[in-house]
């Protein structure tokens, strides 16, 4: 199995971010680590081995990213809530504006162009996976979210600002009109929650 490690500077997060890529071709799947996890956890917990045949056959290509959960969702002590919510949105922009273009470029090296990126994760990783698909169904075409929690109240309690709202699928989907263009896009996505 082809495995590549990347460490690249993120202007959005003002730090180096790490990720690993497993496979040479196939549907790109963006893997979010579970709560407070790291990019290597999916492999270390045996999850890469469970789909090794799909990777080796070129059916899927995994992109295991890092999280900043300790500064956002899980950080309830040191940082003020406004800083935490700001970093939620910075992480969103890191994924969408910086990592997704890299995923597209790396995946295209096999000579084909994916028709969308899937997301997956467990625990808080599932929450990220679902949030990114629901926020950007124009980029993400499927999601497998295992044991996620899709509201911000568990981590932010009663606090809600624009950033928290935009990262809480329960809140923004409930507030979405039935004729919003994303509703039709959701119907075309493969979603497992």
Regions found by a protein language model. Give the residues of each.
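Non-catalytic cap/lid and distal C-terminal segments of serine-dependent acyl enzymes
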Residues: 1-193
